[in-house]
Amino acid sequence: MPMDIETKQSGDLIFRSKLPDIYIPKHLPLHSYCFENLSEFNSRPCLIDGANDRIYTYAEVELTSRKVAVGLNKLGIQQKDTIMILLPNCPEFVFAFIGASYLGAISTMANPLFTPAEVVKQAKASSAKIVITQACFAGKVKDYAIENDLKVICVDSAPEGCVHFSELIQSDEHEIPDVKIQPDDVVALPYSSGTTGLPKGVMLTHKGLVTSVAQQVDGENANLYMHSDDVLMCVLPLFHIYSLNSVLLCALRVGAAILIMQKFDIAQFLELIPKHKVTIGPFVPPIVLAIAKSPLVHNYDLSSVRTVMSGAAPLGKELEDAVRAKFPNAKLGQGYGMTEAGPVLAMCLAFAKEPFDIKSGACGTVVRNAEMKIVDPDTGCSLPRNQPGEICIRGDQIMKGYLNDPEATARTIEKEGWLHTGDIGFIDDDDELFIVDRLKELIKYKGFQVAPAELEALLINHPDISDAAVVPMIDEQAGEVPVAFVVRSNGSTITEDEVKDFISKQVIFYKRIKRVFFVETVPKSPSGKILRKDLRARLAAGISN
């Protein structure tokens, strides 16, 4: 059954899910929604700490989160105040985030590997009143904390001037203040990656996150089918919205167990899957690539995994096929999201309770209770099937706006509620969405459009190439030409000419790579997106091969 296409008065062609709309309890605060069915799985595992195998039950997680809420309140945090969570994946991240939600407070999440300047910039921009971190990162905010009366809480050892997280947990959960949380109140403030400009605070509301989680896991035929016997691998950083939403919040809603890894290590990762019988693996392309290329995979039994989903960046067909062979019982597919969209716009219907057939390379179909359209970037007119254009989404799941930036908000969200993603894609005859590339990342060769993602998919399919990124280089005659940054596989001596020849045999003339630069690593954001602006900056500075 195809998505419904409605012709609006404006002439827009609007795409909707193959799945019927569902009731979503948008009046509930996020924590109430996540724990709505708590009595059904009180004693079941909620969090499993991969570092030490400690298990926290659902009852323990809910109780500890309420204690943390009281502890934060005693330190002065009130409704609509902001806390900063500067942590790698750990149970305390979960307690802090849910605890803040109970207070009607806001969590802004930051990468603990940020420089001190980056951390302070986000703390200042978000008006954070407390930072929750580890002792090894506390120094990054020390001076700013002293100057601005900012309290620093450490989850391990507490250096001088810091509060230990255990003090929060000692609070009496019955002393939680009575707050009236509105559906449109902000609960999470992630900062968008900044790959197309300066990082901006993305205001995600209780209603927005409840809607997004429900679009994935609620309903008789859930789009992303999960249940209380599932174990999700949480290796993606919780400070990124993909992991926070599609791993943590979705799992909490259905009563599944969440296996927490602080960071990705292929050997430990492969060891934990059979040890804890992991059933669902939410990954990003760099992890998928590591699995596909690792010789260690054959030493482990990965048969428990029934779902492998990839998001944050497009995954090529060849990489999909390579990983499919590693997980014998898993359905493999992609989702598509962006922070501003809450984040999920599309999800693979092979993951549904009653699955649909899908095509390799597609990144799903639009989620239910939402609308999608494809527009011409130049004219703004909506486009029919199979024509690439900018992807736009509308629904209760999208952000409220950018914090203190009404101009950027107005540029991103139209008055009619359409959020412009800046991504180029098309919807085919079977209602599946295909991402072509980022609008701003398209290379223009004499007016022809060259999509870096297409060339990258070809490059990493070469056995002597372990990773690659393609960016534009200014050219006097052509305007821009594609150049590649390539990471050689171990022991490889592949040359620039060999790489160029490999690509030229597979693409039209204007897509041929003009230069190849060999590098140790391709710079990427925590979510796995290639940091093209860093590579363009190296070109501008006159990189030498």
Curated annotation (Swiss-Prot):
Q: What EC class does the entry list?
A: ligase
Q: Name one GO molecular function term.
A: ATP binding
Where is ATP annotated to bind? Answer: S192, S193, G194, T195, T196, K200, Q334, G335, T339, D423, R438, K529
Q: Which InterPro entries match?
A: AMP-bd_C, AMP-bd_C_sf, AMP-binding_CS, AMP-dep_synth/lig_dom, ANL_N_sf
Biological process according to GO: phenylpropanoid metabolic process
State where (E)-4-coumaroyl-AMP binds: Y242, S246, A312, Q334, G335, T339, M347, K440, K444
Q: Which reaction does it catalyse?
A: (E)-4-coumarate + ATP + CoA = (E)-4-coumaroyl-CoA + AMP + diphosphate; (E)-4-coumarate + ATP + H(+) = (E)-4-coumaroyl-AMP + diphosphate; (E)-4-coumaroyl-AMP + CoA = (E)-4-coumaroyl-CoA + AMP + H(+)
- Pfam families on file: AMP-binding (PF00501), AMP-binding_C (PF13193)
The coenzyme or cofactor needed here is: Mg(2+)
Annotated spans, SBD1: 265-334
Pathway as given in its UniProt record: Phytoalexin biosynthesis; 3,4',5-trihydroxystilbene biosynthesis; 3,4',5-trihydroxystilbene from trans-4-coumarate: step 1/2
Q: Does the keyword Zinc apply?
A: no
Q: What is known of its domains?
A: Both substrate-binding domains (SBD1 and SBD2) are involved in the substrate recognition, and are sufficient to confer the substrate specificity.
Q: What is this protein called?
A: 4-coumarate--CoA ligase 2
Q: What is the lineage of its organism?
A: Eukaryota, Viridiplantae, Streptophyta, Embryophyta, Tracheophyta
